[in-house]
């Protein structure tokens, strides 16, 4: 039995814990104040004065384990100091005080405290259906679509010749984000289905008012032909690439055509054989099969519509649904919702084995109030010196909400790192991992492709001081700054998706000032290509730092002092390498890149320099070959070459489309200034000046209001207007 304490507070706390089932006996592991043998107060003060400085700033970096030691000094110190704010670590027999971890400002998810509901902007209608998909990977890789040359290119016909069967509010219904609530708008959900003409044949029933969905309008232009309009990123008129919506009321054996009419990129992987994705609930139930590549007659082309003076593009494809009356989903890439992330994190913290070395905290709240989670993963340290010797690795994902492949790579990374594999154990013993699996939860929830609810690309605002407008980015950068003040960060990597290039590759930062380090940043990507030969393309990696990309996480972290700072880009399509050439990536393929990242990290930090030396030698040869190909001359030394000589443009995204102030501040600056009304005295003074300049009167004679009024009435000075 637990020995009763004389302290009334301790007795109350004990009863409280017992009442809620957190404490039943001594095996509970919750320390309660005990009576210990007496000790001099001077002994306690001597121990504190001789101990190492408090590591309160490091308390969030790894999972702290309270070790029960048969040492009465520890408890007598607490009693002598009369404080519960200090806890003690032991380096041998020597107690080292540190501040107790502060209570979290936000709720920490746990089995006894469920995750907070998903918050939506108040103007968003949200259906109550719980959308869930099974994870499944095909037994054989799915091949690219091979064009026949006979693909049709239907042009948009508008609502005059078509029948609108689905329509929701546009992204610009509100000019900027105001506030949010769980479940979105208040009151009953408005119907989004309409039918202008009576149809003998049943029409498809569309829906997208759920997490990550973004279909705005569906127009039936033929019996089985539908024109689709995607909703742009919320509070913007740009960024239509990602799509995800539900379809019901279909017929089996009928060929349907879908044409998305408002895509904004001039080129796409759909032109290189990429296929859309289809999920059938009946197929999942009957066969246990999930997302599949689908479609024929696939074509990506420019249509006859313009928006803001820019041409729009269409994606068209045909398909047959497998069952009558099924519920199906169509998507650009494998969806990965905010709720799915919460479900996965709940599993992690509910497992006592993984929870021993994985601490989950809330880094901050997004604009809508959704939690931005950060995981600290490391093995418990046996001593203070061992803890301080660990280097750090920072990994983030999903700053662009439509790049769901980044979340699948992140899940693979976490699955490997939290597993019981020997390599995973070695990684946890060697490093402290700071992981932010979803940087832009608001954008993910509402189905944006690129922006947050500020209407801006977060990956262009890592330098911004606007904490309230870009909280997820501001707190991430601040966390890394504090981490760098305590220990070396060996690698930073942000997981992304790419819409124009196949394979997986990296963007890095080139060291231009130190020629001896010009190859160092290329070693990690080269090792990745060796560990994933049929998926990772080193030749697609770029290391230029464009001025327009100065606000990206990769460059900002590099300027903070992280030499190996990267974004890892995974295609939406598939591979053009090795045995996987011409095949799509599955979710297992994407997760395998997370496994590969962990393997490469061990190779990169191997104490044996042999791998590093071989890679540097190979890089020197490859770089000279590339320069010879581009410049047409031999190069003996790499020291006098700039990155302009070495590589061309990264052909990345156009960052200017979503740069600038947050939308709500932009609207304030665009408001017209009110015209200031002048007083009568000011108007009279101005009128007097005009009279004098006209030379109709004696300039030396002062004019009074009475004289001025008289001359005005006689029309001698100026016209009435």
UniProtKB/Swiss-Prot annotation:
Residues 50-59, 647-660 have a biased composition (Low complexity). Binds 1 zinc ion per subunit. Coiled coil: none annotated. It catalyses: (L-glutamyl)(n+1)-gamma-L-glutamyl-L-glutamyl-[protein] + H2O = (L-glutamyl)(n)-gamma-L-glutamyl-L-glutamyl-[protein] + L-glutamate. Residues 43-71, 645-721 are annotated as: Disordered. Metallocarboxypeptidase that mediates deglutamylation of target proteins. Catalyzes the deglutamylation of polyglutamate side chains generated by post-translational polyglutamylation in proteins such as tubulins. Also removes gene-encoded polyglutamates from the carboxy-terminus of target proteins such as MYLK. Does not show detyrosinase or deglycylase activities from the carboxy-terminus of tubulin. It is found in: Cytoplasm, Cytosol; Cytoplasm, Cytoskeleton, Microtubule organizing center, Centrosome, Centriole; Cytoplasm, Cytoskeleton, Cilium basal body. The keyword Zinc applies. This is Cytosolic carboxypeptidase 2. SUPFAM superfamilies: Zn-dependent exopeptidases. Its main location: cytoplasm. Its EC number is 3.4.17.-. Zn(2+) binds at residues 400, 403, 496. Pfam families: Pepdidase_M14_N (PF18027), Peptidase_M14 (PF00246). Residues 703-714 have a biased composition (Polar residues). Keywords: Carboxypeptidase, Cell projection, Cytoplasm, Cytoskeleton, Hydrolase, Metal-binding, Metalloprotease, Protease, Zinc. The lineage of its organism: Eukaryota, Metazoa, Chordata, Craniata, Vertebrata. It comes from the Eukaryota. Residues 672-688 have a biased composition (Basic residues). PANTHER family: CYTOSOLIC CARBOXYPEPTIDASE (PTHR12756), CYTOSOLIC CARBOXYPEPTIDASE 2 (PTHR12756:SF41). Gene3D superfamilies: 2.60.40.3120, Zn peptidases. GO terms for molecular function: metallocarboxypeptidase activity; tubulin binding; zinc ion binding. Residues 334-605 form the Peptidase M14 domain. GO terms for cellular component: centriole; ciliary basal body; cytoplasm; cytosol; microtubule cytoskeleton. Its cofactor is Zn(2+). It comes from Danio rerio (Zebrafish).
